[in-house]
UniProtKB/Swiss-Prot annotation:
Residue ranges, Cytoplasmic side: 59-77, 138-164, 233-281, 327-328
Protein name: Gonadotropin-releasing hormone receptor
GO BP annotations, alphabetical order: cellular response to hormone stimulus
Function of the protein: Receptor for gonadotropin releasing hormone (GnRH) that mediates the action of GnRH to stimulate the secretion of the gonadotropic hormones luteinizing hormone (LH) and follicle-stimulating hormone (FSH). This receptor mediates its action by association with G-proteins that activate a phosphatidylinositol-calcium second messenger system.
Gene responsible for this protein: GNRHR
SUPFAM superfamilies named among the record's database cross-references: Family A G protein-coupled receptor-like
Transmembrane segments: 39-58, 78-97, 116-137, 165-184, 213-232, 282-300, 307-326
C-alpha cells in the first residue's frame, strides 16, 4: 500500500526513480497530432486574450484621461481594472507555459524555473477567480446595503488587496512541492528525460489528495458558491422591492430609483458566473476523475483530454468581452 510506506522507503523510491529507471521506446509522452492542435489553439487563444484584455485596459486609461485629473476611477471600474490585470497575468503565464511545455514534452528550464513558474501559474489562476469573487461581493453589497457601501469607501480597495494577497499565499506551496525528476536512459545517463512534477513531495498519498482538493475548492467550488449566493441575494432583493412598489424600485431607505447601471452590473455578474462555470467545469471534471481513477488517462482519448483542458483558456478571453459590453 502506498500510504503505508515510511519516509525512508519513500525517499529510496524517489531516489531510484530519479536516477535508474530505464527509458524504453514508447514509454514516454510525445507530441501527437491532437497535441499539435492543442498547441495551435492555445497560442491562438493567447493572442485573442492578450488583445482583448490589453484593449480594455487602454480603454479604461483613455476614459480616465477624459475625466478630471484628480478624479479617481469609479468603484466598479477599479474592480474591472484589477480583474483585467489578473486575466492578463493568467494569459501571459499559463497559456505560453502550457503551449511550450506541450511542444517540448519534457522540462528543459531547470529546477529553479520549475518551482518559480509552477508558483506563478497557480498564482495567476487564483487571482482572476478571487477578483470575480470580489466583484460579486461588492455588487451584492451595493444592491442590498447601498448606504453602508457608500459610507465605507475603502472596502473595495481592501477586498482587492486581500484577493492579491491570498493568491500569493495560497500559491506558495508550489515552490516546495514542485521539482525535477530525471529518468535514466539505457546507458544509465540521467539526461534521458527530465520533468517538472510533484513526485515524492508528499509523505503520504492523502497529503497530496488533500492539497489537490484544497486547490480545487479555492479555485472553483468556493468562488462559484460565493458568486451564486451573491447573485441570488441581488435577485431576491430586487424582486422583493419590485413587489413592494412596482412603480418605484427603491433600495431600502434610498430615495433614488435603482439606476440602470446597477441592473446592468447584475447582468454582468451573472454573465461572469456563467462564463466561469462553463469554462472551468470540463477542466475540473477531468481533474477530479483523474484523482479518483488515475487509469482514466488510458481510457480517455487524447483529443478529448486536450479539448477539455482548452475550455479553461476561454475564460480570460470571455471576461473582457463581458465587462466591455456591460460597463463601457
Amino acid at each position: 500500500m502506498a500510504n503505508s510506506d515510511s519516509p525512508e522507503q519513500n525517499e529510496n523510491h524517489c531516489s531510484s526513480i530519479n536516477s535508474s529507471i530505464p527509458l524504453t521506446p514508447g514509454s514516454l509522452p510525445t507530441l501527437t497530432l491532437s497535441g499539435k492542435i492543442r498547441v495551435t489553439v492555445t497560442f491562438f487563444l493567447f493572442l485573442l486574450s492578450t488583445i482583448f484584455n490589453t484593449s480594455f485596459l487602454l480603454k479604461l486609461q483613455n476614459w480616465t484621461q477624459r475625466k478630471e485629473k484628480r478624479k479617481k476611477l469609479s468603484r466598479m471600474k477599479l474592480l474591472l481594472k484589477h480583474l483585467t490585470l489578473a486575466n492578463l497575468l493568467e494569459t501571459l503565464i499559463v497559456m505560453p507555459l502550457d503551449g511550450m511545455w506541450n511542444i517540448t514534452v519534457q522540462w528543459y528550464a531547470g529546477e529553479l524555473l520549475c518551482k518559480v513558474l509552477s508558483y506563478l501559474k497557480l498564482f495567476s489562476m487564483y487571482a482572476p477567480a478571487f477578483m470575480m469573487v470580489v466583484i460579486s461581493l461588492d455588487r451584492s453589497l451595493a444592491i442590498t446595503k447601498p448606504l453602508a457601501v457608500k459610507s465605507n469607501s475603502k472596502l473595495g480597495q481592501f477586498m482587492i488587496g486581500l484577493a492579491w494577497l491570498l493568491s500569493s499565499i495560497f500559491a506558495g506551496p508550489q515552490l516546495y512541492i514542485f521539482g525535477m525528476i530525471h529518468l535514466a536512459d539505457d546507458s544509465g545517463q540521467t539526461e534521458g528525460f527530465s520533468q517538472c512534477v510533484t513526485h515524492c513531495s508528499f509523505p503520504q498519498w492523502w497529503h497530496q489528495a488533500f492539497y489537490n482538493f484544497f486547490t480545487f475548492s479555492c479555485l472553483f467550488i468556493i468562488p462559484l458558491l460565493i458568486m451564486v449566493i451573491c447573485n441570488a441575494k441581488i435577485i431576491f432583493t430586487l424582486t422583493r422591492v419590485l413587489h413592494q412598489d412596482p412603480h418605484k424600485l427603491q433600495l431600502n431607505q434610498s430615495k433614488n430609483n435603482i439606476p440602470r447601471a446597477r441592473l446592468r452590473t447584475l447582468k454582468m455578474t451573472v454573465a461572469f458566473a456563467t462564463s466561469f462555470t462553463v469554462c472551468w467545469t470540463p477542466y475540473y471534471v477531468l481533474g477530479i476523475w483523474y484523482w479518483f481513477d488515475p487509469d482514466m488517462v488510458n481510457r480517455v482519448s487524447d483529443p478529448v483530454n486536450h479539448f477539455f483542458f482548452l475550455f479553461a483558456f476561454l475564460n480570460p478571453c470571455f471576461n473582457p468581452l463581458i465587462y466591455g459590453y456591460f460597463s463601457l
